[in-house]
A protein has these predicted regions:
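A ligand-binding cleft/hinge motif common to bilobed small-molecule-binding domains
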Residues: 69-70, 76, 84-94, 180-219
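Bilobed "Venus flytrap"/periplasmic-binding protein-like clamshell domains
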Residues: 30-53, 106-170, 192-193
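Extended ligand-binding regions for polar small-molecule ligands
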Residues: 42-55, 110-114, 118-139, 215-261
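Periplasmic-binding protein-like
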Residues: 29-32, 101-104, 113, 159, ...
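Extracytoplasmic small-molecule ligand-binding "clamshell" domains
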Residues: 21-92, 132, 165-170, 176-177, ...
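Ligand-binding clefts/hinges and TM-proximal coupling segments of bilobed small-molecule sensing domains
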Residues: 58, 64, 132, 136-163, ...
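Hydrophobic residues within well-ordered alpha-helices
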Residues: 51, 74-76, 123, 178-180, ...
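N-terminal signal peptide c-region/cleavage motif recognized by signal peptidases
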Residues: 16-18
Length: 274
């Protein structure tokens, strides 16, 4: 009888701990590989889970397509506390210390002899068939599209929407698939997208960081990536900063597994005690 009572008490305590376990409330896109998806197969999913374990928490996702207005309607509306994969320079929320820095890259087939293509000023870009990712027609397109347009490189450029076909499992893959098929000669794509899909293209591909890294004040080619938090949530930001620092080697292994190209980050100072 006593053993049965002890067992019941143990079960009750376990259930109580589970009910009161800490939640890390995260907003993420349910169909945006290689970053995140509802099956948890993206590298941001894996990094979020890693950080949650470090904090003794479990992840509670709110799924929301990464479109304009997403931060306003999720993080800033209180639907979640964290959004992974935000540019550190974003002015739409607070951000943690960066956990990686990536770059736009030129992507070409290894058998097309374009390994030396690395600069937006390379004269070959005036005749090559180029693929770029586009957001819309309101001037808010990614930096490579704007940089090419400023150079008058327009007629030989083909656009692929950065959102892709949301009915597909990999909406951002088409621009890399087009390079692999030979429909275009080179694509200029954000590094994590390029690295992931190029590694799965079925033909050897070459990636080269785009230079210059800063092509005018409105066209940086390199971005630090952080987790987004509300500006006034300083305590959570400090916690995340410490966890990101502790887990940096594991984060690097995750990024390697997803073929994310990186450029060196400046050293991050230790997070002061609250």
């Amino acid at each position: 009888m006593k053993r049965a009572l002890r067992a019941l008490l143990s079960i009750g305590l376990l259930m109580s701990c589970q009910v009161h376990a800490r939640e890390l409330r995260v907003c993420a896109d349910p169909n945006n590989l290689p970053y995140s998806d509802e099956a948890g197969e993206g590298f941001e999913n894996r990094i979020v889970e890693l950080i949650a374990r470090d904090l003794g928490a479990h992840v509670d996702y709110t799924w929301w397509a990464q479109r304009r207005g997403a931060i306003r309607n999720t993080l800033n509306a209180g639907a979640c506390d964290v959004i992974p994969g935000m540019a550190s320079s974003s002015g739409m929320s607070g951000t943690t210390d960066p956990y990686y820095r990536s770059t736009y890259v030129f992507v070409s087939r290894a058998d097309h002899g374009l390994q030396s293509l690395a600069s937006l000023d390379d004269p070959r870009l005036r005749t090559l068939r180029i693929g770029v990712q586009l957001v819309g027609d309101d001037g808010a397109n990614p930096p490579p599209a704007m940089s090419l347009a400023r150079r008058g490189i327009v007629d030989n450029v083909r656009g692929y929407t950065v959102y892709g076909d949301y009915a597909d499992k990999a909406p951002q893959a088409p621009v890399i698939d087009a390079v692999a098929r030979g429909d275009i000669d080179v694509a200029v794509v954000w590094g994590p997208t390029a690295g992931y899909f190029a590694s799965r293209a079925g033909v050897p591909m070459v990636l080269a960081p785009v230079t210059p890294w800063l092509d005018g004040p409105q066209s940086p080619m390199v971005f630090d990536i952080s987790m987004g938090v509300r500006r006034n949530d300083r305590a959570l930001r400090r916690e995340l900063d410490r966890a990101l620092l502790r887990e940096r080697p594991a984060i690097e292994r995750i990024l390697d597994a997803y073929h994310v190209p990186r450029v060196p980050m400046m050293a991050v100072a230790p997070v002061p005690s609250p």
